[in-house]
A protein has these predicted regions:
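Short loop/turn segments that flank or connect secondary-structure elements
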Residues: 1-154
């Protein structure tokens, strides 16, 4: 009997948020690239493997507390914000796009999400953040933390 395929982090976030990957280059969507997008543990592992650990940081995602979807901050490793923009924003573009490394929040984000149609439980950011708490991500979480710490050793 064939084993059922395991749902990926991207598939779980897509299902929970109701979003699908989009490619839009309108001015509103381009503006979103100024702020770091959240990545799942799988996304962050690919970014580390591509040699960008120096543009990542340990962080606690607390937005969920303010959204009312969780009562604790979620520890994770994410892209850092530079002085003005995301650490991956160079010469008016995100360098991760063409390398296939765009974090899940960025892959699913689109200018159609507005304050008047925002549902915190379906938020892309919340559903990406939940991936850092999922027991099924235990192996990738362990690898990500080890790779991140090893890459950051002096």
């Amino acid at each position: 009997m064939r084993e059922l395929s395991k749902e990926t982090s991207l598939q779980r976030v897509m299902r929970a948020s109701g979003r699908v990957p989009v490619q839009c280059s309108c001015s509103v969507c381009k503006q979103q690239c100024h702020t770091p997008y959240l990545g799942t543990p799988d996304d962050i592992e690919r970014i580390i493997d591509a040699g960008y650990a120096d543009r990542l940081a340990l962080t606690n995602w607390a937005a969920g507390i303010f959204l009312g979807v969780i009562n604790i901050a979620i520890p994770m490793i994410q892209p850092v914000a530079g002085k003005e923009y995301c650490a991956f924003f160079e010469n008016g573009l995100c360098i991760l796009h063409d390398k296939g490394l765009k974090p899940t929040e960025g892959r699913l984000s689109h200018h159609t999400v507005r304050k008047d149609n925002f549902n915190p439980a379906m938020s892309i950011a919340w559903n990406v953040a939940k991936e850092w708490l999922m027991p099924e991500n235990e192996d990738v979480l362990s690898r990500v933390v080890n790779k991140f710490l090893n890459a950051r050793k002096p």
